[in-house]
UniProtKB/Swiss-Prot annotation:
Keywords per UniProt: Cell inner membrane, Cell membrane, Membrane, Transmembrane, Transmembrane helix, Transport
Protein name in the entry: Multidrug resistance protein MdtH
Transmembrane segments: 13-33, 99-116, 139-159, 165-185, 214-232, 242-262, 275-295, 298-318, 338-358, 366-386
First-listed, main subcellular location of the protein, grouped into a coarse class: membrane
Topology in membrane: Multi-pass membrane protein
InterPro entries: MFS, MFS_dom, MFS_trans_sf, MFS_Transporters, Multidrug-R_MdtH
Length: 400
């Protein structure tokens, strides 16, 4: 086995272990934030939505800067620094008794993610061969789902005693992850050339097709990030312990269906068709959520939503990676998170505001119908973009 093949092989295992630690650290804390501050402390959902939206927007919106810096200086220092910063954010969250302190803790957490997330994504693109990326992204998603359930179960158990224990556990896991990267991650370059920060960012911004695709995905992420789902499950069930079953459903579906669906669909369908089909299922499953009154009906709709996500997400990741320029991988993968920044922030803040508005106006279906409509519009916009791309390709072939 050549040294390059050996590095790729070892790199896969490193990425999987690193991802599990990150997912556990995140899901121990974040699924319980809305329950802690909305249900236990009585804050308005919009206050928590602002905090979560701020974290999302900072982490993903500034990702192009984190990616461009990593293109210049390498992945390792950015990843280690970012993980320690997130640990500090979680520690601060444990003592948050005022909205401004929760917002500050989410700001720290988001800045940490800005530093470590783009280089980690770029490492996947660097180490995994193009023909294997779809399946590897599926494995990462399966791991995400299993880690989400384990983290949520652990966090729910710790929440019975003290929310500070929840945050301390998340912080310790990110410190361990930082140590793991500092000890074992080689000083790999992310791009084929050591690209200056400004040049990497400029290269992305001039790629109009990539920029349009990323910005359109904001509508997809408005659906994907919904903080209201745990609150809805809690309201219908009447107990916060029911939230863990929502994550258990996601894990079971992901572990049993994600990899087989990815393997089968990559042989029969284009990436863009898989992304659009998943998005359509997600959109249609959101619309009736506010109209259900039983937990069984709600979990059925959540199952449909997760199946849509299982179809769409590996295709989205693979499509984003395939569009990235190898000369500025960090910058491209950082910018690819901008749709998540915009959609996540609007989804969190707007979703929380609509949820409060729907409750006060006795129209609980309002936020869910709006999300479904946004998903349909995003579906149509992506369809138009992909049809334009195919038309341009046919024109070039005809001219040739």
């Amino acid at each position: 086995m050549s040294r390059v093949s050996q590095a790729r092989n070892l790199g896969k295992y490193f990425l999987l272990i690193d991802n599990m630690l990150v997912v556990l650290g995140f899901f121990v804390v974040f699924p319980l934030i809305s329950i802690r501050f909305v249900d236990q402390m009585g804050w308005a959902a919009v206050m928590v939505g602002i905090a979560l939206g701020l974290r999302q927007f900072i982490q993903q919106g500034l990702g192009i800067f984190g990616g461009a810096i990593a293109d210049r200086f390498g992945a390792k220092p950015m990843i280690v620094t970012g993980m320690l910063m997130r640990a500090a954010g979680f520690a601060t969250m444990g003592i948050a008794h005022e909205p401004w302190l929760l917002w500050f803790s989410c700001l720290l957490s988001g800045l940490g993610g800005t530093l470590f997330d783009p280089p980690r994504s770029a490492l996947v693109v660097k180490l995994i061969r193009p023909q294997q990326r779809g399946r590897f992204f599926s494995l990462l998603m399966m791991q995400d789902s299993a880690g989400a359930v384990i983290g949520a179960l652990l966090g729910s158990w710790l929440l019975q005693y003290d929310f500070r224990l929840v945050c301390a556990t998340g912080a310790v896991l990110f410190v361990l992850c930082a140590a793991f990267n500092a000890w074992l991650l080689p000083a790999w370059k992310l791009s084929t050339v050591r690209t200056p920060v400004r040049e990497g960012m400029t290269r992305v911004m001039r790629d109009k097709r990539f920029v349009t695709y990323v910005l359109t995905l904001a509508g997809y992420y408005m659906l994907a990030v919904q903080v209201m789902l745990p609150i809805m499950v809690n309201d219908v069930a009447g107990a916060p312990s029911a939230v863990k079953w929502m994550y258990a459903i996601e894990a079971c579906l992901s572990l049993t269906l994600l990899y087989p669906i990815a393997r089968w669909s990559e042989k029969h369908f284009r990436l863009e068709h898989r992304l659009m089909a998943g998005l359509l299922i997600m959109s249609l499953s959101m619309m009736p959520v506010g109209m259900v009154s039983g937990l069984q009906q709600l979990f059925t709709l959540i199952c449909l939503f997760y199946i849509g996500s299982i179809i769409a997400e590996p295709a989205r990741e693979t499509l984003s990676a395939s569009l990235a320029d190898a000369r500025a991988r960090g910058s491209y993968m950082g910018f690819s998170r901008l749709g998540l920044a915009i959609g996540g922030a609007i989804g969190y803040i707007g979703g929380g505001w609509l949820f409060d508005l729907g409750k006060s106006a006795h129209q609980p279906e309002l936020p869910w119908m709006m999300l479904g409509i946004i998903g349909i519009f995003t579906f149509l916009a992506l369809g138009w973009q992909f049809s334009q791309k195919r038309a341009a390709r046919r024109l070039l072939e005809r001219d040739a």
